[in-house]
A protein has these predicted regions:
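A cross-domain feature marking catalytic cores of carbohydrate-active enzymes
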Residues: 1-4, 27-32, 66-68, 103-105, ...
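Active-site acidic/histidine proton-transfer and metal-coordination neighborhood
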Residues: 20, 35, 39-137, 147, ...
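Acidic (Asp/Glu)-rich catalytic clusters
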Residues: 8-28, 51-60, 91-97, 128-133, ...
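Histidine-acidic metal/acid-base catalytic patches
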Residues: 60-61, 117-140, 144-245
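Acidic-and-aromatic substrate-binding clefts and catalytic sites of carbohydrate-active enzymes
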Residues: 1-13, 33-40, 71-74, 109-114, ...
Length: 245
């Protein structure tokens, strides 16, 4: 669930709607955006993350996905340090609420202003730096990490450490015409989705496989038909993964 869906009504009312729907909330998106050149900016980010944790707890979401943030012109190493400091500051709140914080590595094309954490290795390094706390995990989105030559190894590392909490599916279209909202339906692009799904399953992941397609192109179509296409393409990915075992 995205946080903007909680706007415009009391949080308790949103929580009741979720419970009555019978749906399981996998996570709340999003927290993060910890880096800043101004301490006041970083402080506001901490407040917002604490609010996200409160919201997640209220609606029964087990986790908050972190888009960790970056600042154009600020060295990535500095931003990564501020990310670790920010997570450490709000982690006690998350643990107290029974909510896990999930670091989501983003594709390097977002390293300018969305996230200085761009690989599974970097996400694991943050977890290690903070002492591998129980309240911290990692979300793997194939759109962001499919290109990484270390991907299979780092999936195994992440899973062994008990950090592989989320798995997001979509595809990478060629050419990509929008850096944010041109994701493909599974099978429309070049990501080896069956192979990646098999890797996370072999590593021990047993959670939801979440389809996450940001696409102006698909949003402009009949959404019932889009949903049918999602189901069919998802089943094809699963069949490919199972056939390769």
């Amino acid at each position: 669930m995205w946080r903007n869906a909680l706007e415009g009504r009391p949080l308790a009312e949103s929580a009741l709607m979720v419970r009555e729907s019978g749906l399981a909330v996998v996570s709340l998106c999003r927290g993060g955006f910890f880096p800043g050149t101004d301490s006041r900016v970083r402080g506001k980010a901490l407040d917002d993350n604490r609010l996200a944790i409160e919201q997640a707890h209220a609606i029964g979401a087990p986790s908050v996905v972190l888009v960790c943030g970056a600042v154009p012109g600020q060295p990535l190493e500095v931003s990564r340090g501020q990310i670790a400091e920010g997570i450490a500051a709000v982690l006690p709140d998350a643990v107290a609420a029974g909510v896990r914080l999930l670091i989501e590595p983003l594709h390097p094309m977002y390293a300018d202003d969305r996230s200085a954490i761009n690989t599974l290795r970097q996400a694991n390094e943050v977890c290690d730096r903070l002492g591998s706390p129980a309240g911290l995990g990692i979300a793997l989105d194939v759109y962001h990490v499919w290109w990484d030559p270390e991907l299979r190894e780092m999936i195994e590392v992440t899973a062994r450490a008990g950090r592989l909490d989320a798995f997001h599916l979509c595809d990478w279209r060629t050419p990509t015409v929008d850096l944010l909202n041109d994701r493909g339906l599974m099978g429309e692009g070049c990501i080896p989705l069956g192979q990646l799904t098999q890797w996370v399953e072999i590593a021990g992941f047993r959670g939801f496989r979440e389809v996450e397609i940001f696409s102006h192109r698909w949003w402009g179509t009949d959404q019932r038909e889009f949903l049918k296409r999602i189901v069919a393409s998802y089943r094809a990915v699963v069949a490919e993964a199972e056939a390769s075992v």
